[in-house]
């Protein structure tokens, strides 16, 4: 009897060339599929909630797969964690309806971009946060971040490629910049994201910090629908997929 399983995993993306399998490159999906093969002796078709790029991390990454194997979800979880490397972990495994799809059933995601704001770098955060030397005024950046809220055409905040053809409108439901000690976090949630959208948003907020823009420039950048108007693309190391939303969670 066919079953559909939802697995939630997390990973440190530092050592991987993103989620998706690539020829001659180590990917999270490739390593995960090898662990699945060790456990099930077969290769299920994995449906992922998203595709993270090289060096991007995930605190919650969801995938679904249909199985005819009768292994209980809790046993599959334990067996996968046995075969997976220390920088990937399965958090949960549960049966879901057959029509559930990790990507197409998703109604939103939350990302967090982490910035270590201290003149001295932290060796423990290398590859896990952006190191920014000069003091960040989180209140000014939070003011700028409020302008991302709502439904907008985010053409100015994406890298164009064949993954993003068509509608560039996304609805941002959460956008804030906060500080906890020396760690500054940009948190943003939306019904969907364009390619490099969060990293370009972050780069633009840092450009506000540097005086290239003022918070009130953000609406003009959005309205311009031109990538050249926004700030640079922030490095991948500070980006985390924080949460994936499915009904009725949102």
Task: List PLM regions with ranges.
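Structured-RNA-binding interfaces characteristic of tRNA pseudouridine synthases
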Residues: 1-250
